[in-house]
């Protein structure tokens, strides 16, 4: 304590303490007011985007209602004649749901609605990162509210849709974990007679890794013509729970065993004939990175092992964010001869 402070009278000391309390009170009050304003702005923005969804026109669907098989965690879509199933693949919608992402969320809603309106798909498959609960970019930790916004969007568009999780859907600091969000989707899905009656979703078997491993089969004239395997590529490795080091997880061995058993189960149902399939998940296989780096090193031209068949790479310097651990899925795909495409 300084000499001047020692010489203060008791009344002066009380006045000083009172002054400090007043200043502290003003600071705390100002912080509370700022937080209140941000919460209010976030709520207003969220409601504004929800109203935008309510004003959209339904696109609708012309396929028969799919049938859910709870025992095998699978849906079956039936078509007939020369009818083909049109699938729209989306990923990384990144709905923030907070005061920092109001405009971006609106753009995401408009982009999805425009794509669905133009393509008029029979089925939309979303491969993760629907929610983006990163607080310094979204302004919230509430990942359920973000998922619910997308669910309301797809319900309004009135098309069948399915999803898997990405690394951002359930961050370690989010309010709700993976199983809780999976339960929310499942309880609102077609399987449970939920309010999103065109959502095809299942948490999948309890005894394997992940919270959304399930199958969508397509039948035509009593034969299976296509299967879609929806798989959870999980989020981050155990030593990087916050994803700071970009140490991504992968498709685990027991999930690959499940995939193989599903390919063989559907083959048996199809009279012993292998059914063509596609796989949908979020985090790419390491083979994606190997192929992309080889293609890029060759001046973005085909090599003996890599052929760029279709599409446009808009970000030539973008790296493939995959796990450092190799999943056995790619080898299983080659061995079984069913899957013709993998989409992330």
Where are these regions (language model features)?
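His/acidic metal-ligating clusters that form di-metal
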Residues: 119-122, 227-230, 242-344
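N-terminal Lys/Arg-rich, disordered targeting/topogenic segments
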Residues: 1-22
């Amino acid at each position: 304590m300084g000499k001047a402070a020692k010489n203060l009278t008791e009344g002066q000391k009380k006045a000083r303490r009172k002054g400090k309390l007043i200043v502290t009170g003003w600071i705390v009050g100002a912080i509370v007011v700022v937080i209140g304003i941000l919460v209010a702005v976030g709520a207003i923005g969220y409601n504004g985007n929800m109203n935008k969804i309510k004003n959209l026109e339904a696109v609708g669907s012309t396929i028969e209602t799919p049938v859910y098989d709870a025992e095998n965690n699978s849906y079956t879509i039936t078509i007939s004649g020369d009818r083909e199933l049109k699938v729209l693949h989306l990923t990384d919608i990144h709905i923030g749901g907070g005061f920092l992402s109001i405009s971006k969320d609106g753009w995401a809603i408009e982009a999805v609605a425009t794509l669905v309106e133009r393509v008029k798909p029979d089925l939309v498959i979303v491969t993760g990162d629907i929610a983006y609960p990163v607080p310094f970019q979204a302004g919230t930790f509430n990942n359920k509210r973000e998922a619910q916004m997308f669910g309301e969007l797809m319900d309004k568009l009135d098309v069948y849709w399915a999803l898997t999780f990405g690394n951002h859907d359930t961050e370690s600091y989010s309010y709700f974990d993976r199983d809780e969000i999976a339960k929310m989707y499942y309880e609102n899905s077609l399987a449970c007679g939920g309010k999103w009656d065109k959502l095809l979703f299942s948490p999948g078997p309890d005894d394997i890794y992940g919270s959304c491993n399930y199958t969508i089969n397509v039948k035509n004239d009593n034969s299976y013509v296509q299967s879609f395997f929806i798989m959870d590529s999980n989020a981050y490795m155990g030593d990087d729970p916050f994803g700071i080091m970009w140490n991504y997880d992968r498709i685990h061995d027991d999930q690959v065993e499940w995939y193989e058993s599903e390919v063989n189960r559907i083959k048996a149902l199809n009279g012993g004939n292998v059914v063509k399939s596609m796989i949908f998940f979020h985090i790419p296989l390491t083979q994606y990175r190997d192929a992309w780096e080889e293609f890029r090193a060759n001046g973005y031209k085909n090599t003996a092992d890599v052929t760029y068949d279709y599409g446009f790479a808009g970000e030539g310097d973008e790296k493939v964010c995959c796990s450092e651990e190799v999943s056995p899925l790619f080898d299983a795909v080659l061995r079984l001869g069913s899957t013709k495409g993998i989409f992330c």
